[in-house]
Amino acid sequence: MTRFILASGSQIRADILRQAHIPFEIIKSDVDESVIKAERADLSPRDMALCLAEAKVEPVSLAHPDALVLGADQTMELDGELLDKLPQASLARARLERMRGRPHFLHSGLALLRAGQPVWRYQQTSTIHVRGFSDAFLDQYLENAGFALTASVGAYAYEGLGSQLFERVEGDYYAILGLPLLPLTAVLRDHGVLQQ
């Protein structure tokens, strides 16, 4: 079997791989996203997701040339603007009020490298339609959402309480969580990480 490394500290991505029984190691990349976002501010939010994934995976891949190494990132776009994770939970109300009753886009970017060379790149966009929730619901949500307010760019955990924010979604469940699993497992089978 081919050695497979996830170059990410994302707990949700690691959980997805574990739940799918995919053998992997975690070696977190120490790339500073803010530097890349500043240097590549010309990119669309969709292309930024792939750019960040590639930037994160490259140093880990070069350090472990025998392995397939996956970099993954996700960006959020609202009204054409790339939004970042909130630095503090107190800003979540304004973010969620801005999102209320409107769609936003989650762009997932995956880059798989071996010895620093690209093996596979993938992008997928999901459209999330936020419902016109009441102020009372928003108060309750903010009181109970906890870590999700700053852990994800949308101030929600789609797989948890955050699911109550939405009226509908267009996209794959795993892509919304930040790791499009089915296209990934197909390429992992092709490269000997998983059985055909």
Swiss-Prot record:
Free-text function comment from the UniProt entry: Nucleoside triphosphate pyrophosphatase. May have a dual role in cell division arrest and in preventing the incorporation of modified nucleotides into cellular nucleic acids.
Main location per the UniProt record: cytoplasm
Protein family according to the UniProt entry: Belongs to the Maf family.
Q: Name one GO molecular function term.
A: nucleoside triphosphate diphosphatase activity
Q: Active-site positions, per UniProt?
A: D73 (proton acceptor)
Cellular component, GO annotation:
cytoplasm
Protein name as annotated: Nucleoside triphosphate pyrophosphatase
Locations listed in the record: Cytoplasm
Taken from the record, one Pfam family name reads: Maf
The protein's Enzyme Commission number = 3.6.1.9
The reaction(s) catalysed by this protein are: a ribonucleoside 5'-triphosphate + H2O = a ribonucleoside 5'-phosphate + diphosphate + H(+); a 2'-deoxyribonucleoside 5'-triphosphate + H2O = a 2'-deoxyribonucleoside 5'-phosphate + diphosphate + H(+)
Instruction: Please list the GO biological process terms of this entry.
Output: nucleotide metabolic process
Which species is this record about?
Answer: Maricaulis maris (strain MCS10) (Caulobacter maris)
Keyword annotations from UniProtKB, A to Z: Cytoplasm, Hydrolase, Nucleotide metabolism
What cofactors does this protein use? Answer: a divalent metal cation
Q: Which domain of life is it from?
A: Bacteria
Q: Does the keyword Cell cycle apply?
A: no
